[in-house]
Amino acid sequence: MSHASIKSLAGENHLVIRGSRMKLTIIARSSDDFGVVVNSEERHKTKQSIFKVNVTDADLHELTESRVDKDHLVEFAFTFLLEREPVDDIQSAFNIKIISQYFPEFPEAVQNWIDENAE
């Protein structure tokens, strides 16, 4: 069960996870590399964390059968991670497939997310 609520506003996602308000911004740096900016606010303190995520075409096909765009997969991956660990525990740079080494349920969660959001 998801503990996050998500509201998309102008290409940014506003999240509430475990009582913390967060703004998630995904920036495509190249066809395979994405910047992720997480602005979090808890008890009137604001913090910004910046990440680099690599998603190859092969990764996208393996995880999603190319049914979603890379930026949407990165967005889902960060929501998934933030539901499970504090922002400070997320590696600053990683390939998206490494998530399943720490969270074996990630590929299945991706498939469930795609199936729930299929048109």
What role is predicted for each listed range?
Residues 68-76, 94, 101, 105:
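Generic alpha-helix structural propensity
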Residues 19-63, 95-117:
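N-terminal intrinsically disordered, cationic/polar leader segments
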Residues 52-87:
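Acidic, aromatic-enriched beta-alpha/helix-loop junctions
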Residues 87, 116-119:
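Ser/Thr/Pro-rich, acidic low-complexity intrinsically disordered regulatory segments
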